Every structure is written in C-alpha cells, then in structure tokens.
Amino acid sequence: GYMETTAQMAEEYPDVYFSHGTGYMSNGKNFNNYFGRIYQPRYLSGIVAGMNTKTNKIGYVAAMGSENSEVTGGIDAFALGVYSVNPSAQIYVKVTNSWYDPEAEKAAASTLLDMNCDVITQHCDTTYPQLLAQQKNVYSIGYNSDMSKDAPDACLCSVIWNWSAYYTAAVQSVIDGTWDGSNYYGGMNENLVGITQLAYCLLYTSPSPRDYAASR
C-alpha cells in the first residue's frame, strides 16, 4: 500500500486525519492504520469446508506464501476450522504471488481441481476460483464480499469485510474529539469481518458454523 507516503503526508498536514488500511504505523496524532481479525470468519469457513468435503481434499488459492503473515494466519485459522470437524481432511495450497492476477488464480484453482479437491477457497481478489468450482460442480468458499452472486450453485458461504464499520467509528471519533491516532484491529464483535449465510442447500441440513464453534 501507501503506508509510508501516508505517514509523510500526515506530518505535512497536521490538521488533517489520515487512516491507512492494512499497515502497522501510527503517530499517535493524526495518522493510524486499520485492519481486522479476518482469521475469525476464516475459522468458521473452515468448519463449513470440513463438513462438506467428500474427497477430504480441500484447495486454497493463496495470494502470497509463508512470508506473508496475513495469508499464513488465514490459512492456519481455516485449517483449524477444518480439522475441528474433519481431522482426516487435507488442505492443499497454491500460491499466485499476487493479490490480483486473474490468470494465476485460474491456473491455481484448476490445479487444485485436478487434484480432486471438492471444496475450493481463496485469499485473492477475483471470483475465478468460484467460477471454476461451479463449472466443475464442486463447492467453494468466497472472500472479500458475498461471491454467491457469481457462483450460486457452488459458493457455500463467503468470508467478508465490512469496512464501513471502521469508517463510521473513525469519523465519529473525529467528530467527538476522541480520535487518538492509535491503530485499529476490529473483528466479528465490531462487525468489521464476518461470514455470510450458508448456501440455501445447507441451511436445513447443517448447523451454522457459529453454532458449531460455540458448542465446542
């Protein structure tokens, strides 16, 4: 992103508030970073995947490799969710080395499908993994926003961001005079991240992932 540039601009314009997404810097005055506990709904989506694989092979299209803590943390949380309901399942990861690369995402998803993965999830920005899953008549789990609109017959649920939860709180803190320039790290309690409703075909045949996780 533009974290360092934003930090510099904040120093040049001390009367303006700057908030940068997905970084870590702050100055305690007029500049901070914000992000979310996306691992929380990732865990729940893992429960969904673990309950619905028949081949016990689950594919994960990842934007970055093990050097990226955001992606790695998401994979770990997803895997913990899978193994909580299906310890026999295996998770196969293919890395695209890009947050947005349609061709690489298609290739990664195709490879996972050729490996007989019957649930595909992703940490990348296009819907191609979902579309390929639908073409192959297997299940998928979306990311960023509700991808069931793109793959209605495949998408079991999506792990989603609701950035408005932070934007509203940040603007209100400026209005109230309570902004302190500290970094923000919200989660499901703050409605910053979440998981969509299960696909209609699962609504009456499976417990919700939240209910299952709460019962453990």
Tell me the role of every PLM-derived stretch.
Residues 11-35, 145-153:
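Flexible loop/hinge segments that line or gate small-molecule binding clefts
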Residues 1, 19-21, 115-126, 143:
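Periplasmic-binding protein-like
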Residues 204-216:
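Single conserved hydrophobic/aromatic residue that forms the stacking wall/gate
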Residues 92-103:
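Short beta->alpha junction loops
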Residues 102-116:
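Short, well-structured alpha-helical segments in soluble
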Residues 157-206:
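Structured C-terminal subdomain patch of bacterial secreted/periplasmic proteins
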